[in-house]
Design a protein with these regions (language model features):
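Lectin-type carbohydrate-recognition ectodomains
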Residues: 1-179
Length: 179
């Protein structure tokens, strides 16, 4: 909405560069869940169900060039190649859990935004927020990802939850250590 500031007659424009993120999870015994957006939980918590695949797309992706690339660490497979554009990362119909994820922004989008994400993993709960290619989840110890949240945040602005947590360095859990 465009409005007028009556104090100075300066036009106030909305953020025409708003870009959101939509994502869905394929969950054990459930299948594909409905798409959610902008920090909403996809997957389940408290039910012991693994996420087996994810897809991620931009909402209002016309403002800047670029997109989101993402990869999953899969049980018995390891890291898959990065995908983008809503393509599936993970597996469907093979009963293999995602154990960790990482995401990056590409093109002009990466110059103006950061991508923040966090996972809820078995036996641990919610991991701290990570961003821009950092690993969220576990590798080498077979803890399943059960839920995830994703947010795009304009560089220089912190999402409230992120501000409250102030990202911890490399919160991925690895065999025999956490770093």
């Amino acid at each position: 909405m465009t409005g007028t500031n009556t104090d100075s007659d300066t036009e106030i424009e909305p953020d025409k560069y708003y870009i959101g993120v939509r994502y869905a999870a394929h969950v054990q015994n459930i299948g594909w869940q409905n798409e959610v957006s902008d920090g909403t939980t996809s997957g389940t918590t408290g039910r012991g169900l693994q996420i087996e695949a994810i897809n991620i797309v931009l909402d209002n992706s016309t403002s800047y060039s670029g997109g989101i690339s993402y990869a999953s660490h899969i049980k018995n497979i390891g890291w898959q190649n990065e995908v983008s554009g809503g393509n599936i990362s993970g597996t469907v119909g093979r009963n293999l859990q995602i154990e960790a994820i990482k995401m990056n922004l590409t093109g002009e989008l990466s110059e103006h935004f950061d991508i923040y994400y966090r996972t809820h993993i078995a036996d641990v709960g919610w991991m701290p927020w990570t961003k821009n290619g950092q690993i969220s989840g576990s590798t080498g110890i077979s803890y399943r990802v059960e839920a995830l949240r994703i947010n795009l945040v304009r560089k220089g602005h912190l999402h409230l939850e992120v501000l409250q947590i102030i990202i911890k360095i490399s919160p991925c859990i690895h065999r025999n250590r956490q770093h």
